[in-house]
Amino acid sequence: MLTFKLVHLIQYHSDRLADSLLCQVKMSGRARSYCNVSPVELKDRVHDIYHHLGSWLLDKRESDIDQRYAAIGARRTEQQVPLSELIWVIVLTKNTLYKFVDDVSVPGQVADIAEKQELLQRLSQFFDEAIYATTAGYEHAAAQRVHPPQASAKTRTNTRQVG
């Protein structure tokens, strides 16, 4: 059973975790293009993940994660954030959670170790899916920018008749 204590602690400290991540992004040489992303927007996105973590891990379907993260990928395409930097920030987001879980876990207690392992496994699955969906959304938006969808043949015909 997923430890609600650890999830609750993450949710309770979501502001602090989001602030920590923002600081890491600013300091990272691997996320330079994030100057194109509003700090408020980034903090809101990260805070939402941390604050609603239990819901994301227990209640959300894969399609919910896909939809949410594909939109993030598309948005970062618009903001001209390279895919490598986008993925790096997702990795930083995950690592911030991992470090927090390590910091608040009581070492040596078998029950806590099992609960921690379960949480880390679920987090890993969540972030793997998030990385895939983000990349797919990013690639789709990038392809749309290079080759915008053409008007349908019917629309082109109607336009010619009017003009």
Task: Please annotate each region the language model reported.
Residues 65-163:
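Long, amphipathic alpha-helical coupling/dimerization segments that relay conformational signals between
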